[in-house]
Amino acid sequence: MAAAFSHVIFDLDGTLLNTLDDLAAAGNHTCEMHGWPTFTVDEYRYKVGNGMLKLVERFMPAEYAGDGRAFEQSLAEFRAYYGEHKEDHTAPYAGTIEMLDRLRAAGIQFAVLTNKDHISAAPLIEKYFGSERFALVQGRVDAFPPKPEAPVTLHVMKELGANPATTLYVGDSNVDILTGHNAGLKSAGVSWGFRGRAELEAAGADYVVDTQDELAKLILGE
């Protein structure tokens, strides 16, 4: 039986890697430097997903909204701390490497498309997944608007030589479901990530899976 999809584009945070503790630690470190309120790890589940710029906006106190100088300083502090500590607690979700190798053995090509700064995303993929598994890693760069806008997804598709009809976008949040749909792709949500099944279904996910094995079977048409 032919695979249902020939290409898969994965989100990173909350999909392949559990990065939440390290993102929360960097956010709270920045807040503490300014004497601002901090947040629980669970509260950060709903602050991440749209890239580091939005994350910083979301943990800054409301009275600093529109304060460009405070924002730029906080962003620089966050990036510096996260850059040094992004691997403290981060790890692949259980079963992820095995799933990727199963797909790769079946001839599926896959890439990463994330709103995480490219300078952070690329080293994390290299460390936890090696340099051979992913055909392309695309983090946030100034040349493209962030997900869920379509241009960066279409760029990845072009680089892969992928057909929209046989390409699946996989992620853990409403942003990811929209990312796929905005580029004309089917979108699969993974319930093990930061947001959960209810958000994915409400966002209109074409599929929602609970395990890496379910995802592999979906992609392979088993």
Where do the model's predicted regions map?
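Hydrophobic, well-ordered secondary-structure segments
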Residues: T30, G51, E77-D88, A111, ...
